């Protein structure tokens, strides 16, 4: 693995990224990782996808959003709009070959938004999206999984202070800002739906407390296209990071990449 590099993203913020596997010059379909809320590019699933890129000599790219990992910026300044803009920038500027976009949790929402924007504004770049893998996709999370779930007391705190420290079983509390919630409302997908020409695979744990299966089903139902499937993993939690679950993620991404290369039908 090469060392961490930095790209000057939108607004001049330096975004940390890693290139894995081969270069784009081999012409093979590669991978593009989009991580979750408060996650970084060195997480278990990101590392598993990076290892797959190296093992199969395919290009892989992963990066940290602003306020995440090794990138510049404060987490509490971040919004869906900014992280989406950064994702688009990295896809266009740092990848050249076809890619399978693999998005986890919030990264699943960003993957769908990325495809939506490129299909509308840059069809040439959109054609390089050869498939999308959504892991516990948290589309519309600022509304459906945050604001709608908050008690009146939490909502009052947000409106008065601009931030709510949401307890997390994964570590320190998650700061949820009113700015994030208000901005997220601009990017809601589930009610309007989204048509995608590329294959889409949704992988969802049946015991996920953060993005419940019912929400993943809403995502599934909101998407239309020629090849969309959803796999429910018995007993799987939000992380989906056991050895078997990581193998499923890898196999799913590789199958789509091989199909894009014409290796499998």
Regions found by a protein language model. Name each.
Residues 37-50, 214:
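The serine-hydrolase catalytic nucleophile loop
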Residues 1-24:
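N-terminal cap/lid segment of alpha/beta-hydrolase-fold proteins
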Residues 68-95:
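Catalytic nucleophile-loop/oxyanion-hole region of alpha/beta-hydrolase
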Residues 125-233, 237-265:
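The alpha/beta-hydrolase serine catalytic core
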Residues 27-36:
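Short beta-strand element of the alpha/beta-hydrolase
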Residues 38, 65-69, 139, 237:
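Alpha/beta-hydrolase active-site loop signature
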Residues 48-72:
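Conserved alpha/beta-hydrolase
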Residues 90-153:
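Primarily recognizes the serine-hydrolase "nucleophile elbow" in alpha/beta-hydrolase
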């Amino acid at each position: 693995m090469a060392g961490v590099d930095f790209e000057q993203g939108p607004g001049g913020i330096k975004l940390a990224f890693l290139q894995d596997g081969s270069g784009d010059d081999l012409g093979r379909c590669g991978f593009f990782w989009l991580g979750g809320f408060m996650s970084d590019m060195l997480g278990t699933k990101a590392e598993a996808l990076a290892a797959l890129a190296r093992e199969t000599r395919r290009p892989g790219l992963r990066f940290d959003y602003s306020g995440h990992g090794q990138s510049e910026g404060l987490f509490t300044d971040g919004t869906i709009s900014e992280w989406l803009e950064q994702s688009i920038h990295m896809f266009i500027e740092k990848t050249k070959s076809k890619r399978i976009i693999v998005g986890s949790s919030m990264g699943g929402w960003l993957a769908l938004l990325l495809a939506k924007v490129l299909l509308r504004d840059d069809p040439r770049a959109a054609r390089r999206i050869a498939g999308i893998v959504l892991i516990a996709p948290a589309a519309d999370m600022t509304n459906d999984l945050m604001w709608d779930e908050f008690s009146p007391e939490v909502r009052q705190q947000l409106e008065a202070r601009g931030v709510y420290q949401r307890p997390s079983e994964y570590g320190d509390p998650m700061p949820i800002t009113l700015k994030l919630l208000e901005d997220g409302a601009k990017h809601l997908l589930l009610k309007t739906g989204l048509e995608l020409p590329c294959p889409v695979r949704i992988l969802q744990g049946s015991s996920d407390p953060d993005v419940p299966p019912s929400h993943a089903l809403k995502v599934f139902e909101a998407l239309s296209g020629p090849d969309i499937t959803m796999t429910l993993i018995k007993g799987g939690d939000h992380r989906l990071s056991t050895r078997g679950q990581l193998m499923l993620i890898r196999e799913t991404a590789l199958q789509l990449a091989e199909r894009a290369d014409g290796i499998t039908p």
